[in-house]
């Protein structure tokens, strides 16, 4: 997770399906916020909703070939400076664990054929996994990635979607591997909307915090709703019947040529 607003909604979706999804852990990555902020945000949401049993690990702090990552001002306009719509949540003081890449590797090896990884940010952690631990490529696991744009315009450039744009080299590494990868792209997620009439049903202390966060997100979009980008990727685990998947070869280029 690069825990911004729609990542938080995706996490809450998972937490609401505890009988159907066994959440083994979260690895943080850069994107909507810096990696360490992402990790702290994830812990904050987990603790608020009584899931202190779920560990959070640090992942990669910068795109492939880069030494650092700085959140752009336009991203802060979407998710707020804290990634949570500038809403003051009770901060978790739980430990952020190190080496999220090894954690993913350990979980794949411990649960062969029964692991689904849902990257809702740049694919840098997954690229690092395959580069550092190539043995996992021989073990069955599934990736459901929120990213990309095929038949619609990107949301950063005319062709680029934000998650893959932030690390095209990392995305390219992942797409070059012979793995089970489902891409939940803007073509799908921009058809999934969250309206004020729905969030107005949320109440109580926790509900009002989340409502305030989502209101920030809706106000940015200026169309009367917000897109459910990352929750759509989680939905693909629980309800694959809602989706039509096309089995096609894809690759990522960072050279400006298609």
Language model feature labels by segment:
Residues 13-23, 162-169, 184-258:
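Conformational coupling and interaction surfaces
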Residues 48-49, 237:
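Alpha-helical structural context
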Residues 58-60:
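A conserved beta-strand->alpha-helix junction
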Residues 64:
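Feature marks short, surface-exposed loop/turn motifs that line or immediately flank catalytic pockets
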Residues 73-75:
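Large eukaryotic, non-enzymatic subunits of multiprotein complexes that serve as scaffolds/tethers
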